[in-house]
């Protein structure tokens, strides 16, 4: 701006200067006048699923909420990055194992795998699961006592035994039963989750002998703490369920230590005490499940026949409720995908690119495996590739993985912008699908 222009501008009043042009001046304001608002994320579609907000994060990846645009069912998705899995010992193997196990399990107390989606370009895998509103450990942490009333603990424990009995009937040893791996639905149904370290016994195995364990240290039995080469897999789960019952009824752990070595030393000795307020029936059940000798440790059938298990307990204390969401403080745990769904219904073809993001190269694997991976039970002895009769991985748009476009995301966007009719048609069909589901 030269001297002449500045002199001319000096002749204007403040109100007139404001109307000259916002890009001409930088107006300084007091910091108290600034309203800071978090940037609103755009809606994101992964195949037929509308992405919601973050539910939690673990060592393997993030867990987010999802909405199925066809059924309007609430889902949870575990987002796994291949690069991150490679940095975790047995990371990729554990994920593949969990998918192979979950795809053949159907029980009300075992988490259900709904879909497996794969993005080759981003090297991401999406494990779509049934939605659970809260984890048991989160509920325990929300109260000072860190425990449940006996009535509530009994209800959860009975469901845990139901789910555990089903897993054992399918020849599966979970190996990591603990409150952190037990999820709850909105109606209070318990779901056993996280089968990443589980082991499927051979169909013709003589017994339940196992040789490896990767479970949480505080829930491991003496035979593992003492370093035995082989052990009974089912009795490991019984022990872990016993530690879980001890924890949810007392708020304590039967064995503790300043470090893992001291913890395993205490577990290896097998000496523990039970608070007196537990009462004789519960104390007897805990001693049976936490028996040092695996051969004498309670079986599922003995647990079911125990007086404490069969007794109908009175509701003497207030139940521990599902706590508010730690992220939003929403006590109702409302569906986080709703705001993004509203954005899609406010659709304008001219604002298509600003409305939502779509991951195009999503592969839906019909057999719940990573594209190119042959399930162990279906692989031939000679290691040949998938047979002609086996299901193939297909993309959401109907193409096969080999037919996927190698264009970058920027190139695909440019291609879409050069063909506005195709872009508008694609977006309109997706939103029309959502609108139809909402009306139904």
From Swiss-Prot:
Keywords: Apoptosis, ATP-binding, Cell cycle, Cytoplasm, DNA damage, Kinase, Magnesium, Manganese, Metal-binding, Nucleotide-binding, Nucleus, Phosphoprotein, Serine/threonine-protein kinase, Transferase, Tumor suppressor. Its cofactor is Mg(2+); Mn(2+). Residues 49-309 form the Protein kinase domain. Residues 430-440 have a biased composition (Basic residues). The active site is at 176 (proton acceptor). The keyword Cell cycle applies. It is found in: Nucleus; Cytoplasm. ATP binds at residues 55-63, 78. SMART domains: S_TKc (SM00220). GO terms for cellular component: cytoplasm; cytosol; membrane; mitochondrion; nucleus. It comes from the Eukaryota. InterPro entries: Kinase-like_dom_sf, LKB1_c, Prot_kinase_dom, Protein_kinase_ATP_BS, Ser/Thr_kinase_AS. The modification Phosphoserine is found at residue 435. GO terms for biological process: activation of protein kinase activity; cellular response to starvation; DNA damage response; establishment of cell polarity; glucose homeostasis; intrinsic apoptotic signaling pathway by p53 class mediator; negative regulation of canonical Wnt signaling pathway; negative regulation of cell growth. Its EC number is 2.7.11.1. The modification Phosphothreonine is found at residues 336, 365. Tumor suppressor serine/threonine-protein kinase that controls the activity of AMP-activated protein kinase (AMPK) family members, thereby playing a role in various processes such as cell metabolism, cell polarity, apoptosis and DNA damage response. Acts by phosphorylating the T-loop of AMPK family proteins, leading to promote their activity. This is Serine/threonine-protein kinase STK11. It comes from Gallus gallus (Chicken). The lineage of its organism: Eukaryota, Metazoa, Chordata, Craniata, Vertebrata. The gene is STK11.
């Amino acid at each position: 701006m030269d001297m002449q222009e500045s002199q001319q501008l000096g002749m204007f009043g403040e109100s007139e200067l404001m109307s000259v042009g916002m890009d001409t001046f930088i107006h300084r304001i007091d910091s108290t006048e600034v309203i800071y608002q978090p940037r609103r994320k755009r809606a994101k579609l992964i195949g037929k699923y509308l992405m919601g907000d973050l539910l939690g994060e673990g060592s393997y990846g993030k867990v987010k909420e999802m909405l199925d645009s066809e059924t309007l069912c609430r889902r949870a998705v575990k987002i796994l990055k291949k690069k991150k899995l490679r940095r975790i010992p047995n990371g990729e193997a554990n994920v593949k194992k969990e998918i192979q196990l979950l795809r053949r399990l159907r029980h009300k107390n075992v988490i259900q795998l709904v879909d497996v989606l794969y993005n080759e370009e981003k090297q991401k895998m999406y494990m779509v699961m049934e939605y659970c509103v809260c984890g048991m450990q989160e509920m325990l942490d929300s109260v000072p006592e860190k425990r449940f009333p006996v009535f509530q603990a009994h209800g959860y424990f009975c469901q845990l035994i139901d789910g555990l009995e089903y897993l054992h009937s399918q020849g599966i040893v979970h190996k990591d039963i603990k409150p952190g791996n037990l999820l709850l639905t909105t109606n209070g149904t318990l779901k056993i989750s996280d089968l990443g370290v589980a082991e499927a016994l051979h169909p013709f195995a003589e017994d339940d002998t196992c040789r490896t364990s990767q479970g949480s240290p505080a829930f491991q039995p003496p035979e593992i703490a003492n370093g035995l080469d082989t052990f009974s897999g089912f009795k490991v789960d019984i022990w872990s369920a016993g530690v879980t019952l001890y924890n949810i009824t007392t708020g304590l752990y039967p064995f503790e230590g300043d470090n893992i070595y001291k913890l395993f030393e205490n577990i290896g000795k097998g000496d523990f005490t039970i608070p007196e307020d537990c009462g004789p029936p519960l104390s007897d059940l805990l001693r049976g499940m936490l028996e040092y000798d695996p051969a004498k440790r309670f079986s599922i059938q003995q647990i079911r026949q125990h007086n404490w298990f069969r007794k109908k307990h009175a509701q003497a204390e207030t139940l521990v409720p599902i706590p508010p969401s730690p992220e939003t403080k929403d006590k109702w745990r409302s569906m986080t995908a709703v705001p993004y769904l509203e954005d899609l219904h406010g659709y304008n073809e001219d604002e298509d690119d600003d409305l939502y993001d779509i991951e195009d190269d999503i592969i839906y694997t019909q057999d719940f495996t990573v594209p190119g991976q042959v399930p162990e039970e279906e692989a031939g002895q000679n290691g040949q590739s998938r047979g002609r009769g086996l299901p193939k991985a297909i993309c959401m748009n109907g193409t096969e993985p080999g037919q996927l476009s190698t264009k970058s995301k920027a190139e695909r966007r440019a291609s879409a912008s050069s063909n506005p009719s195709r872009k508008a048609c694609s977006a309109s069909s997706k939103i029309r699908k959502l609108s139809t589901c909402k009306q139904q």
